[in-house]
Amino acid sequence: MKKLGREIDILVNYPKAKRDLSARLESKSEESRAIGRKFGFDYFDGSRNHGYGGFNYSQRFWQPVIPTIIENYQVSNSSRVLDVGCAKGFFLYDLKLELPEISISGVDISEYAIENAKPEIRKYLQVANATKLPFADDSFDFVMSINTVHNLNLQDCALSLQEIERVSCRNSFITVDAYRNDEEKARMEAWNLTALTMMAVDEWKDFFLEIGYTGDFYWFIP
Protein backbone atom coordinates (compact mmCIF):
# COMPACT_ATOMS: atom_id res chain seq x y z
CA MET A 1 0.00 0.00 0.00
CA LYS A 2 1.29 3.44 -0.89
CA LYS A 3 2.14 5.77 1.98
CA LEU A 4 0.90 9.27 2.59
CA GLY A 5 3.38 12.06 1.88
CA ARG A 6 4.40 14.80 4.29
CA GLU A 7 2.09 17.53 5.53
CA ILE A 8 4.55 20.40 5.20
CA ASP A 9 4.17 24.14 4.66
CA ILE A 10 6.88 24.96 2.14
CA LEU A 11 5.09 28.27 1.50
CA VAL A 12 5.74 29.43 5.05
CA ASN A 13 7.74 32.40 3.71
CA TYR A 14 5.16 33.40 1.08
CA PRO A 15 3.68 36.80 2.04
CA LYS A 16 0.27 36.50 3.68
CA ALA A 17 -2.32 39.13 2.76
CA LYS A 18 -5.04 40.30 5.11
CA ARG A 19 -8.39 39.57 3.47
CA ASP A 20 -11.80 41.13 4.08
CA LEU A 21 -13.83 37.94 3.87
CA SER A 22 -17.15 39.60 4.73
CA ALA A 23 -16.79 42.10 1.88
CA ARG A 24 -15.93 39.36 -0.56
CA LEU A 25 -18.90 37.29 0.57
CA GLU A 26 -21.27 40.23 0.11
CA SER A 27 -19.96 41.09 -3.35
CA LYS A 28 -19.76 37.53 -4.65
CA SER A 29 -22.47 35.93 -6.76
CA GLU A 30 -22.94 32.87 -8.92
CA GLU A 31 -22.26 35.15 -11.87
CA SER A 32 -18.93 36.17 -10.33
CA ARG A 33 -18.03 32.51 -9.78
CA ALA A 34 -18.93 31.66 -13.37
CA ILE A 35 -16.77 34.50 -14.69
CA GLY A 36 -13.87 33.59 -12.40
CA ARG A 37 -13.97 29.94 -13.44
CA LYS A 38 -13.28 30.91 -17.05
CA PHE A 39 -9.74 31.83 -15.87
CA GLY A 40 -9.49 34.58 -18.46
CA PHE A 41 -8.77 38.31 -18.29
CA ASP A 42 -11.51 38.92 -15.74
CA TYR A 43 -10.05 36.36 -13.34
CA PHE A 44 -6.45 37.52 -13.51
CA ASP A 45 -6.59 41.22 -14.34
CA GLY A 46 -10.21 42.32 -14.04
CA SER A 47 -12.32 43.18 -11.00
CA ARG A 48 -11.58 41.78 -7.55
CA ASN A 49 -15.11 40.39 -7.64
CA HIS A 50 -13.97 37.94 -10.30
CA GLY A 51 -10.45 37.07 -9.15
CA TYR A 52 -7.11 38.67 -8.40
CA GLY A 53 -7.87 42.21 -9.49
CA GLY A 54 -4.47 42.39 -11.20
CA PHE A 55 -2.10 39.41 -11.33
CA ASN A 56 1.30 41.06 -11.58
CA TYR A 57 4.87 39.95 -10.95
CA SER A 58 6.71 40.90 -7.78
CA GLN A 59 9.91 39.35 -6.53
CA ARG A 60 8.60 39.52 -2.96
CA PHE A 61 6.26 36.57 -3.52
CA TRP A 62 8.25 33.57 -4.74
CA GLN A 63 11.86 34.55 -4.14
CA PRO A 64 11.56 34.02 -0.33
CA VAL A 65 9.98 30.58 -0.94
CA ILE A 66 12.52 29.15 -3.37
CA PRO A 67 15.27 28.42 -0.79
CA THR A 68 12.77 26.30 1.18
CA ILE A 69 11.89 24.33 -1.96
CA ILE A 70 15.55 23.83 -2.84
CA GLU A 71 16.33 22.61 0.67
CA ASN A 72 13.37 20.24 0.99
CA TYR A 73 13.47 18.72 -2.48
CA GLN A 74 17.16 18.93 -3.45
CA VAL A 75 16.31 21.06 -6.48
CA SER A 76 19.43 22.03 -8.42
CA ASN A 77 20.60 23.23 -11.82
CA SER A 78 20.33 19.64 -13.06
CA SER A 79 16.71 19.20 -11.92
CA ARG A 80 13.57 19.02 -14.04
CA VAL A 81 10.67 20.95 -12.49
CA LEU A 82 6.99 21.16 -13.49
CA ASP A 83 4.44 23.68 -12.21
CA VAL A 84 0.85 22.49 -12.73
CA GLY A 85 -1.37 25.57 -12.74
CA CYS A 86 1.56 27.86 -13.44
CA ALA A 87 -0.59 30.90 -14.37
CA LYS A 88 1.79 33.55 -15.78
CA GLY A 89 4.86 31.60 -14.71
CA PHE A 90 6.10 33.81 -11.90
CA PHE A 91 7.36 30.93 -9.74
CA LEU A 92 9.24 29.35 -12.63
CA TYR A 93 10.72 32.70 -13.60
CA ASP A 94 12.13 33.23 -10.11
CA LEU A 95 13.34 29.63 -9.95
CA LYS A 96 15.20 30.13 -13.22
CA LEU A 97 16.82 33.28 -11.83
CA GLU A 98 18.09 31.29 -8.85
CA LEU A 99 19.12 28.22 -10.90
CA PRO A 100 19.85 29.36 -14.49
CA GLU A 101 20.54 25.86 -15.86
CA ILE A 102 17.45 24.20 -14.43
CA SER A 103 14.90 22.59 -16.78
CA ILE A 104 11.46 24.12 -16.22
CA SER A 105 7.99 23.41 -17.59
CA GLY A 106 4.62 24.90 -16.76
CA VAL A 107 1.05 24.08 -17.72
CA ASP A 108 -2.18 25.97 -17.15
CA ILE A 109 -5.76 25.63 -18.37
CA SER A 110 -5.85 29.37 -19.04
CA GLU A 111 -4.92 30.50 -22.54
CA TYR A 112 -4.96 34.07 -21.25
CA ALA A 113 -2.40 33.32 -18.53
CA ILE A 114 -0.01 31.58 -20.91
CA GLU A 115 -0.35 34.32 -23.54
CA ASN A 116 0.43 36.92 -20.87
CA ALA A 117 3.17 35.00 -19.08
CA LYS A 118 6.62 36.38 -18.29
CA PRO A 119 8.17 36.78 -21.76
CA GLU A 120 11.51 35.41 -20.57
CA ILE A 121 10.03 31.96 -19.89
CA ARG A 122 6.93 31.80 -22.07
CA LYS A 123 8.55 29.20 -24.32
CA TYR A 124 8.59 26.76 -21.38
CA LEU A 125 4.84 27.05 -20.75
CA GLN A 126 1.83 25.55 -22.49
CA VAL A 127 -1.93 25.30 -22.22
CA ALA A 128 -2.90 21.88 -20.88
CA ASN A 129 -5.43 20.19 -18.62
CA ALA A 130 -4.17 18.90 -15.28
CA THR A 131 -6.13 15.69 -15.83
CA LYS A 132 -4.01 14.81 -18.86
CA LEU A 133 -0.49 16.17 -18.56
CA PRO A 134 1.40 16.16 -21.89
CA PHE A 135 4.54 14.52 -20.52
CA ALA A 136 5.97 11.01 -20.32
CA ASP A 137 6.12 8.99 -17.11
CA ASP A 138 8.83 10.05 -14.64
CA SER A 139 9.65 13.23 -16.57
CA PHE A 140 10.28 15.48 -13.55
CA ASP A 141 12.30 15.49 -10.34
CA PHE A 142 9.86 17.90 -8.69
CA VAL A 143 6.24 18.68 -9.54
CA MET A 144 4.38 21.49 -7.79
CA SER A 145 0.73 22.52 -7.96
CA ILE A 146 -0.46 25.45 -5.86
CA ASN A 147 -4.20 26.07 -5.34
CA THR A 148 -5.08 24.34 -8.61
CA VAL A 149 -6.28 20.77 -8.04
CA HIS A 150 -9.28 21.90 -5.98
CA ASN A 151 -10.63 23.84 -8.98
CA LEU A 152 -11.68 20.48 -10.44
CA ASN A 153 -14.56 18.23 -9.48
CA LEU A 154 -13.73 15.28 -7.24
CA GLN A 155 -13.26 12.79 -10.07
CA ASP A 156 -10.94 15.14 -11.94
CA CYS A 157 -9.07 15.92 -8.70
CA ALA A 158 -8.23 12.23 -8.56
CA LEU A 159 -7.12 12.18 -12.19
CA SER A 160 -4.93 15.26 -11.77
CA LEU A 161 -3.22 13.89 -8.66
CA GLN A 162 -2.63 10.58 -10.40
CA GLU A 163 -1.12 12.51 -13.32
CA ILE A 164 1.21 14.38 -10.95
CA GLU A 165 2.18 11.02 -9.48
CA ARG A 166 2.78 9.59 -12.98
CA VAL A 167 5.04 12.35 -14.34
CA SER A 168 7.07 12.75 -11.12
CA CYS A 169 10.02 10.43 -10.57
CA ARG A 170 10.97 11.89 -7.17
CA ASN A 171 9.03 14.58 -5.35
CA SER A 172 5.81 16.55 -5.57
CA PHE A 173 3.96 19.15 -3.52
CA ILE A 174 0.42 20.52 -3.72
CA THR A 175 -1.81 22.90 -1.81
CA VAL A 176 -5.60 22.63 -1.76
CA ASP A 177 -8.51 24.43 -0.11
CA ALA A 178 -9.28 22.79 3.23
CA TYR A 179 -10.66 23.37 6.71
CA ARG A 180 -10.24 21.89 10.19
CA ASN A 181 -13.44 23.01 11.89
CA ASP A 182 -16.82 24.63 11.21
CA GLU A 183 -15.45 28.16 11.59
CA GLU A 184 -12.77 27.56 8.97
CA LYS A 185 -15.33 25.88 6.71
CA ALA A 186 -17.54 28.97 6.90
CA ARG A 187 -14.58 31.23 6.09
CA MET A 188 -13.64 28.99 3.18
CA GLU A 189 -17.15 29.14 1.76
CA ALA A 190 -17.07 32.92 2.08
CA TRP A 191 -13.69 33.18 0.36
CA ASN A 192 -14.09 30.57 -2.36
CA LEU A 193 -14.52 31.75 -5.91
CA THR A 194 -13.25 28.98 -8.18
CA ALA A 195 -12.84 25.76 -6.14
CA LEU A 196 -15.19 22.89 -6.95
CA THR A 197 -13.78 20.54 -4.30
CA MET A 198 -13.26 21.57 -0.69
CA MET A 199 -12.82 19.07 2.14
CA ALA A 200 -11.69 18.80 5.73
CA VAL A 201 -7.98 18.10 6.06
CA ASP A 202 -8.55 14.51 7.19
CA GLU A 203 -10.89 13.92 4.26
CA TRP A 204 -8.17 15.13 1.88
CA LYS A 205 -5.66 12.78 3.49
CA ASP A 206 -8.01 9.83 3.10
CA PHE A 207 -8.59 10.87 -0.50
CA PHE A 208 -4.84 11.00 -1.22
CA LEU A 209 -4.45 7.48 0.13
CA GLU A 210 -7.46 6.22 -1.79
CA ILE A 211 -6.30 7.50 -5.19
CA GLY A 212 -2.58 6.83 -4.67
CA TYR A 213 -1.09 10.30 -4.33
CA THR A 214 2.15 9.97 -2.33
CA GLY A 215 3.54 13.49 -2.65
CA ASP A 216 3.69 16.20 -0.02
CA PHE A 217 0.80 18.54 0.64
CA TYR A 218 -0.49 21.49 2.61
CA TRP A 219 -3.64 23.55 2.92
CA PHE A 220 -5.00 26.90 1.86
CA ILE A 221 -7.14 28.08 4.79
CA PRO A 222 -8.19 31.77 4.60
Give the ranges of each region predicted by the language model:
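Hydrophobic adenine-recognition pocket in adenosine-nucleotide-binding enzymes
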Residues: 148
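A conserved beta-strand element that flanks and buttresses the S-adenosyl-L-methionine
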Residues: 144
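Class I (Rossmann-like) S-adenosyl-L-methionine-dependent methyltransferase catalytic domain
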Residues: 1-73, 78-134, 152-159, 163, ...
